[in-house]
Amino acid sequence: MNFLAHLHLAHLADSSLSGNLLADFVRGNPATHYPPDVVEGIYMHRRIDVMTDNLPEVREAREWFRHETRRVAPITLDVMWDHFLSRHWTQISPDFPLQAFVGYAHAQVATILPDSPPRFVNLNDYLWSEKWLERYRDMDFIQNVLNGMANRRPRLDALRDSWYDLDAHYDALEERFWHFYPRMMAQAARKAL
């Protein structure tokens, strides 16, 4: 899962949206640096990452990547799940339009920015103003996201080519998304994530 899915599942679970978004920028035990609700959100994010990576649908999808891109498949798939969530938002969350949800999420996350790591603050400078969460529905934007990550981290250069794996398996990936994401939503609503 990437930014949008983590925020969405956190909302369904009444968990800290701030903690769920911040989690990738925090190493080790967050309890000494953040309030309890944010800490709980960080831990929820970590549990979701482990759970998602071990879902049969996701493990199957990783196998569809070519040898040269399989190493980055988990990252590429996380971004792709956000694509499907953004694309199908009106079906998934008919009572909370995406633009309104993004505004709500932004307001929640903004409260922790003064005490956040600089890299997280930098992400937030772009995430909201450039409307990344809404733009995830556009596959051209997904390609830009993958290229941007590859530019920032040369070790992940294979992300550029992983675009072709997404394109080649788009329909099958979308089908897998519909298999597992509604289950995760139900688990979030039961506070079982």
UniProtKB/Swiss-Prot annotation:
Protein family membership: Belongs to the AcpH family.
Keyword annotations: Fatty acid biosynthesis, Fatty acid metabolism, Hydrolase, Lipid biosynthesis, Lipid metabolism
Disulfide bond annotation, renumbered to this chain: none
Its job: Converts holo-ACP to apo-ACP by hydrolytic cleavage of the phosphopantetheine prosthetic group from ACP.
GO function term, MF aspect, one: [acyl-carrier-protein] phosphodiesterase activity
Gene from which the chain derives: acpH
NCBIfam families linked: PRK10045.1
Annotated catalysed reactions: holo-[ACP] + H2O = apo-[ACP] + (R)-4'-phosphopantetheine + H(+)
Keyword Cytoplasm set for record: no
EC annotation from Swiss-Prot or TrEMBL: 3.1.4.14
Name of this protein: Acyl carrier protein phosphodiesterase
Domain of life: Bacteria
